[in-house]
Design a protein with these regions (language model features):
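Surface-exposed, low-hydrophobicity beta-strand/loop segments enriched in small/polar/acidic residues
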Residues: 1-177
Length: 177
């Protein structure tokens, strides 16, 4: 038997009412988060209310990475300034917005030296981005109007924190609430 000591804290209320959830929850795949770094260290825990998507082949849920654009970028830009605390890493593919109407390309560098924002640099431009838009993880490099999400499964959100130091961590999953 293992004993784990943990400080208790209260998350701000994020789920007021559960209308539909995934019965039995789901297993969160942590392999996609290996290259997500915070203060130079790998992430050891996901907070609640994280978007995950189901891989129909394996049945595992993968985190759908996003980042809020913090400064407008021109149509020919390859560097995008985004808010801190995103989960992107070098090698991930991104597109602008969840409508998947833009192009997608590979992240070649992430500059985290500024205290206010991170700068994500891509191999080629994915188009103009307005402040407040969201960079969304994509499957691979695509031209405009051809970007795809990494998996074709249902999008849900986690209902509790997920310990990433443990393989095959379970989580309650909210479909509608």
């Amino acid at each position: 038997m293992y004993r784990k000591r943990e400080r208790e804290f209260q998350y701000p209320p994020g789920i007021e009412k559960i209308i539909e959830d995934v019965i039995g929850g789901g297993t969160i795949d942590r392999r996609d988060l290996r290259n997500a770094l915070f203060n130079g260290k790998s992430l050891d825990e996901l907070p609640p209310i994280v978007i995950v998507v189901k891989d129909p082949e394996t049945g595992l849920y993968h985190v759908l990475k996003t980042a809020l654009v913090s400064e407008a970028a021109a149509a020919d830009a390859t560097a995008y300034k985004v808010a801190k605390n995103h989960l992107f890493g070098v090698g991930d593919f991104v597109t602008i917005g969840g409508a998947l109407t833009g192009a997608s390309d590979k992240i070649t560098a992430i500059d985290k030296s500024n205290a206010e924002f991170d700068t994500i640099t891509l191999e080629a431009t994915i188009g103009a981005a307005a402040k407040g838009q969201v960079l969304v993880q994509a499957k691979d490099k695509q031209v405009a109007k051809a970007a795809k999400l990494p998996y074709d499964g249902e999008l849900v959100v986690t209902m509790n924190k997920v310990d990433l130091t443990v393989a095959n961590q379970q989580s309650g999953l909210l479909v509608r609430g």
